Regions:
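Regulatory, non-catalytic segments
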Residues: 2-175
């Protein structure tokens, strides 16, 4: 009888705790105030990242839109690639994955990523995977059409409001 009471009490406690848990951001968010900061030098601890972006099978067949990428850590270090797409190749085709080498300042653990799209075609990324020398590989699950003209993505940094004020950037990306 005592064991049953303890079991019910533990079940109730688990349900109570889970019902009060804070949700994590599971959908990408727009970030209108996001700024690329070009104030610092591009040679500040140069690292190379591999960024693999998979395009959803429910995206359009191919996009000619311009796609930019920015990612970084909770300490304000930012890596920026102003244009990943290549209008002369088959970049960002439906059901495909494209990998890019992006050079930029060395970050700690990457905790945010934003994509920016300009153009009329539209595009639906599935995942963005970032591999860096000083951070564990990280995958962000977009699975949504990118709106045009606004930074759109995820920010899991603990100091979400402070990273854009002291960030550094790079502008070299190659496929």
């Amino acid at each position: 009888m005592l064991i049953k009471a303890v079991h019910y009490l533990l079940c109730f406690a688990c349900i109570y705790v889970l019902s009060h848990a804070e949700p994590i951001i599971s959908q990408p968010q727009s970030f209108a105030s996001f700024k690329i900061n070009n104030d610092t030098t591009q040679n500040e601890g140069s690292c190379v990242y591999t960024v693999t972006i998979s395009t959803s099978c429910s995206s359009i067949s191919a996009t000619r839109d311009h796609i930019s990428l920015a990612f970084g850590d909770a300490y304000g270090i930012q890596v920026y690639a102003p244009r990943l797409d290549d209008p002369w190749s088959s970049t960002f085709e439906r059901c495909s994955a494209d990998s890019f080498r992006v050079k930029g300042p060395c970050t700690h653990q990457i905790c945010y990523v934003y994509l920016y799209r300009t153009g009329r075609d539209g595009w639906k990324p599935d995942t963005v995977k970032i591999f860096g020398y000083y951070s564990k590989p990280v995958t962000f699950y977009f699975r949504a059409f990118l709106p045009g003209g606004i930074w759109y993505g995820f920010n899991y940094c603990s100091s979400a409001s402070s990273f854009s004020s002291s960030s550094s950037s790079s502008s070299s990306a190659s496929k």
